[in-house]
Amino acid sequence: RMIHAMIDLETLSTNPEAVILTVGGVKFDPYNTIEPSQGMYFRVDVDSQTAKGRDVMQDTLDWWATQPKEISDEALGDKDRISLEEMIKTINKWSVGVDVFWCQGPLFDYAILQNIYKQLGHPVPWQYWQIRDSRTLFSLVPKDPNEQRTGMHNALEDCYFQAKKVQKIYKQLNIK
């Protein structure tokens, strides 16, 4: 079986040059309902990114100000932030053996990661043809009115939720 991974970023901008706040990831098998596992989650040092000219948008700061306190505190708090080099090492190590890389809108998460990898002079740990978009898949089925959602905008919880939803839709569409 191929290994699928879901990645999600929380950022301070919607541009490819965005400052990254947090990175989340889970590995999963879309062909069954086994719990997503091998979670990856960390917070990235903001000052080193702004020093490199990475983007912060006022609209995004304003948006963060509207989020529940526990969500914005987790994303914006100062504790336990890792360097950009450490971020790249962590993502690269976690990505070993992954065949398919999912996210909700590749022009966001993977565009930002690709941009920062290039800025730091590193190749990305995926090929363009390995990228999948959960948003496209989700648009193929009617929205579930009973869908319960917690922890939105926590990068790890978003990944878990999106991976579970991919599994559910593969089953619904009888994708084998």
Question: Each predicted region: which residue ranges?
Answer:
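Anionic group-transfer/hydrolysis microenvironments
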Residues: 10-12, 26, 105-106, 111, ...
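Short, flexible loop segments at boundaries between secondary-structure elements
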Residues: 125-145
